[in-house]
């Protein structure tokens, strides 16, 4: 399309419409303006899984926790795809991308349905704590089925495909927001936290970290869970 003149609002209009509500500004500018208007207590309230509403600024409450490791979880009826360990066994990253794309489409629909019912509860948002890209070496760990197995390269490849499928390819808007978890050497059998001390620097950099690096650099994953 064509544009003429400055698209920024006039000073008169700017006085009427806060920057954070003005779509002529970038997301970064709008977010910075919104945060600058918050009190310390309001900022802190946004840093939890259950973020409170800020009525005076028109900010609704939001529940960040949703899951979609192999389908939309806990938010009504949705397609259940094979567990990630099964998807990894196909060695087909194009298939994994297709699965993730279908999941995010359903996520969008379920999000809109929940909002129309006035449902703002947990598991109804567009921020998903998926995929799990931990390295599965020890079968005693009870969450191995959530991962893509023990190989760092395969985990990276599958994880990148999954994130791209979830988040979509629109240059401006996310379809949904993915979250790579759990950073970083999380996937070991242990009765306490001492297990982590057994991870060598070599193992950390060659085995546990490559998938996280790939998802950040190649897939622009929206967030990482510590």
Which sequence ranges carry the predicted segments?
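Glycoside hydrolase catalytic-domain context in secreted enzymes
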Residues: 2-226
